[in-house]
Each structure stands twice: as structure tokens, then as C-alpha cells.
Amino acid sequence: MHLSEITHPNQLHGLSVAQLEQIGHQIREKHLQTVAATGGHLGPGLGVVELTLALYQTLDLDRDKVVWDVGHQAYPHKLLTGRYHNFHTLRQKDGIAGYLKRTENRFDHFGAGHASTSISAALGMALARDAQGEDYRCVAVIGDGSLTGGMALEAINHAGHLPKTRLLVVLNDNDMSISPNVGALSRYLNKIRVSEPMQLLTDGLTQGMQQIPFVGGAITQGFEPVKEGMKRLSYSKIGAVFEELGFTYMGPVDGHNLEELIATFREAHKHTGPVLVHVATTKGKGYPYAEEDQVGYHAQNPFDLATGKAKPASKPKPPSYSKVFGQTLTTLAKSDRRIVGITAAMATGTGLDILQKALPKQYIDVGIAEQHAVVLAAGMACDGMRPVVAIYSTFLQRAFDQVIHDVCIQKLPVFFCLDRAGIVGADGPTHQGMYDIAYLRLIPNMVLMAPKDEAELQRMLVTGIEYDGPIAMRFPRGNGIGVPLPEEGWESLPIGKAEQLRQGDDLLMLAYGSMVYPALQTAELLNEHGISATVINARFAKPLDEELIVPLARQIGKVVTFEEGCLPGGFGSAIMESLQAHDLQVPVLPIGVPDLLVEHASPDESKQELGLTPRQMADRILEKFGSRQRIGAASA
């Protein structure tokens, strides 16, 4: 049987180990070819090929349910559930999603994108099953990185108190999340995976037996079960931890040995209470470049499969916002020992790896623990430090209560730097940074700012570190505009003060962050049609520069706002609230992301679909304010 013939995972039933190994080879081949062409998550899926095959051979997936944590390791799952023939559309607009989606396939039982949710979801399904008198298996597959998240531990604590609830947790232990895992639990798991004294003892005994004349080989072969028993004795400590929490513990199991995996899963399915199967895997298995660089090959842009190198860009690009952030923060930290960068398992993605290498004592990685990261920062701020929490916009949502309760109520100088704010592209709705303006703007004592380009980001970094209270800066994914970047001597910005970039009499255009340059381009298009616009770089969404904005709105009488975020509660809402508070009744056109989920596509495709290109925005402005001539029609 070929992988291309599999449309239902139950087709794996009855296949021999040799046949499964052949399908596993085909999965890796298709996985590598596709990600090399489209980009996507590489290492996670390559590491769970055998795990997926063995698990699915022992389940009846017409009835049983598997929940994959995060979802970036679920490409083999997708290939075994009827998506082989359109897998080439992975992460493309209207194609296969990079994560799990309930609406995409009936075997995607729970959507995901953020970490540590799988055990809670699978336990919920198990409790629903029992409440309705049904009979099927519920399985959560979770990585050791996700297990550092508090929600996963909360779910384990709950499940362990339900001895009659049948639940299987498969711990995919590859000693990695995106970056190397941190924390006591991860260190403990790693001790269990590689117990050096026990390894040396068993290897030494094996070598000694092999040297016995005539019978050494036979004795060595007979010693193998004893050797495995000695190793498992060294593993018993971690098992004791889970057993004390109410789980039956099985493992560690070689995550690339199909026979051992199948036997273990079959045994696990016999239990009637919560079971944890500990599977040791290698991230990037089967592709040498990914095995050697597990951080770099966690996710990849399109690359050359033969060399493992990224495909060259058509022309040199400016540095990314993340890189400018990391370099600038590191420079500032060298002269200010109060500065400490904090990340939640995203050092490379946020640019904090630059700080980590240069000033490791001023860098903290808390693991996948956003709530802890925020309160840790609050505690450090209490005692004189200047913590900088570098985090993706979408992940700060997970610590919303802590931002309010532990930072803003106490007016502590914690600086939130929100990477991937706005449209992020192929990762889809779980990762779009749409909501931070709205959910942070409503909190008292919080200051919000966003740079128009990478040079202004440098100045805002200084501003945030100097500010004696809660403050947040959002910036987009990807490369900067390409403006000159001073290497030092950055000046702070006055809090709540905007910048006028263009003078005009017909229209007031107020732009925030990444939408400033598109607003300027829109103004140029409107100027070709006889409409002159004043363009303001707002810089701050809270507080607004009302001394500048309100008189201009009163004078000009027509207002357009621009933001790369959700319109409900966002920057445009802030402007309208301000104008209303000043009893100013002028027409306002808010431009941004409407009340919908932005699906996976390239950023340019998403902006086109949302009407956020300069030409589309100019057309909307002409339509709103009375011109019948459209930009597109006029220039056709």
C-alpha cells in the first residue's frame, strides 16, 4: 500500500511493521518535499511519524478521538486522514491549514495553535463520553515543551483525580519545544531520557561480556532483557511522579521503534483510568540537517532540500523588526544592568536570542508559561529592575488577567514588546496579532505605542525602558521599511505625542504603527484626484495626542483612521471616543480588520482580501466622502 492510497487512518489496521515502515518513509518524503516548497513546520512532524502510525494502528478512528497539542507536529496526521493529494497547498490561501481545524477534516477533533491545551480538551471529551454513556477512547498527544505550560499541569492534576475516566496521554519527549526547553520539569525529563551512569554501566557490562571467549555473544544476547530492565529501573523516578498524580505510567518508549510503540499502546488501551505513555523521539528525525539544528529547522521558509539552505531572496531585504528589536535592546542593556529580557520559550522568534548570547545574565526564558512571565516581570519591577517582556501579540492574550491584576493595578514599570502584531500570514487565525490594541487599551494605567518603522522602534525601546509604569509596544512580523538605523544615541519620545507627516486641507488621516506608510501611499493616490490629506503618525493609541488631533478634526471635518488590528475596540474606536468626548460630530471612516477571523494566507493576500492595500483604501475613502470616481477605474 502507498501513502497516496490512504484516505482513512483505519486502513493502517492489519499492516505489518515492514509495511508501516514503508509508509513512514513515504510520509517523511512527502513532508520534506512539501515544506521545502511551501515553508512550514519541519522538525516537529518528522519526529512523530512512527508515533502516529503506531497510535493510529491501535485505534478505531471512526470512534476514537485524538487531540494534538499545538498542532505543528500533526502533518503526518494530516497525510493519513485524506489530505495527501492536496497537501501541496499547505499553508497557502484556501489550502491545507498549518494547524488543526475542526472545519477542515472530521479527524481534526480539536483546533489548536497555542500550546498546552490538549490534555484539557481530551479530558473534556472523555467526561462528555462518560456522561452520555458512550464508549470510545480519548487521546492527547503533547510535547515535553507544552508540558511546561501551567494549563497542561492543571489538566493532569484534574485527570489524576478521576481513576475511572479512561484517558490516554502520549508524552512526545524530544527535549525541545521551539527552542530548547527550560525549567525543572524539563531538566528532570531529560535526566530520565539519558541517565549517563546507567548507560555507562549497561554498555560496560555488554562490552565485557562480548569479550568472553566462545560464549560471549550468547551471553550478551541473553543479557539484553536484564540491560533493559536496569535502564527502566533508572526511569522509574519520573514514572513515580505521574503515578503519584493518579496516572498509570508506561515508558519511556523508543519513539522510532514501531514494534515497541504498537505493543505499548495496545497495553495502554487495556487500562480503564488515566494512562501516560512516555515516548522518546528525535525532532527532525530522518533529515540530517533538521536533526543537527533542531531550533533552526523547527519551522522553515521555502528551502533547498539537498542543501537544507533557505532559497535566496530576489533582492536584499532590510533587517526584520525582531532583529532590530533584539540588537537595540542588547545595546541598551549593556549600559543599563536593570534591563532584563524575558521570553516564554520564543527567544529566536522575538530576537531575544541576541540578548541571550551577549548578556545571558540579563535574559530569562520561563518556558511556555506566559502568565508566569508577566508576574515574574512584575516582581522584578517591584525591586528596581526594568523587565522587557518580549512576546507575540497572540500569546500575551494568555496572560490578560496578570497584565491587569499584577502589573497595571500596581502601576509597575513592565515593558511589553509585542512581536507579530497585526497580520502574520500562513499560521492563520490562532496566530494573527489582531486584538492587542483593543484588549490592552481598556486597562487603566497602560500606555500603548507602535512604531511606523524600525528606526522609530529603536526610539520607542528607549521610551518604554525610561517610562515609570506599564507600557506596551506592538510591531509587525517581517522586514522593516529599510530606513537608516542609528547604532546608538536614540532619543526617547514624549508620551502621548503624535507626528504630523503631511499637510492637507480636505481630509485628516490618522495612522497607527505599521499602517503609517500605507496611509502615506493612500494620500498620494488621493492627491492625484485632487484630495489633499493631512497625515498623522499617531505613535500612541493611549494616550492619544488630543491637543493635535481634536483641533485638526474640527478644522478639516473628515477623518480616516488606519490600523492593522481589529476594528472593534481598536485605534479607530479610540479616536471616535475622543472626538465624541469633545462633542465633535465629524464623519469618521475607520479602516482596519473587521469583526472576522483572518484565515491563513500570505500577508499580502490577506491585506488584499481585507481591503487594506493603498488603492483599495483610497477607493473606500472616495466612496465614503462622495466621489463617484474610483482610483482603480481611473488608473485602469
UniProtKB/Swiss-Prot annotation:
Signal sequence residues: none
Key words, A-Z: Isoprene biosynthesis, Magnesium, Metal-binding, Thiamine biosynthesis, Thiamine pyrophosphate, Transferase
Catalytic reaction annotation: D-glyceraldehyde 3-phosphate + pyruvate + H(+) = 1-deoxy-D-xylulose 5-phosphate + CO2
Annotated Mg(2+) binding sites: D144, N174
Enzyme Commission number: 2.2.1.7
Cofactors required: Mg(2+); thiamine diphosphate
GO BP: 1-deoxy-D-xylulose 5-phosphate biosynthetic process; isopentenyl diphosphate biosynthetic process, methylerythritol 4-phosphate pathway; terpenoid biosynthetic process; thiamine biosynthetic process
Cofactor binding mode and count: Binds 1 Mg(2+) ion per subunit.
Pathway note: Metabolic intermediate biosynthesis; 1-deoxy-D-xylulose 5-phosphate biosynthesis; 1-deoxy-D-xylulose 5-phosphate from D-glyceraldehyde 3-phosphate and pyruvate: step 1/1
InterPro entries: Dxylulose-5-P_synthase, THDP-binding, Transketo_C/PFOR_II, Transketolase-like_Pyr-bd, Transketolase_BS, Transketolase_C, Transketolase_CS
Domain of life: Bacteria
GO molecular-function terms, A-Z: 1-deoxy-D-xylulose-5-phosphate synthase activity; magnesium ion binding; thiamine pyrophosphate binding
Gene3D superfamilies the record matches: 3.40.50.920, 3.40.50.970
Recorded GO CC terms: cytosol
Stated family: Belongs to the transketolase family. DXPS subfamily.
Function (record text): Catalyzes the acyloin condensation reaction between C atoms 2 and 3 of pyruvate and glyceraldehyde 3-phosphate to yield 1-deoxy-D-xylulose-5-phosphate (DXP).
Subunit structure as annotated in this protein's UniProt entry: Homodimer.
UniProt protein name: 1-deoxy-D-xylulose-5-phosphate synthase
Organism: Synechococcus elongatus (strain ATCC 33912 / PCC 7942 / FACHB-805) (Anacystis nidulans R2)
The gene coding this protein: dxs
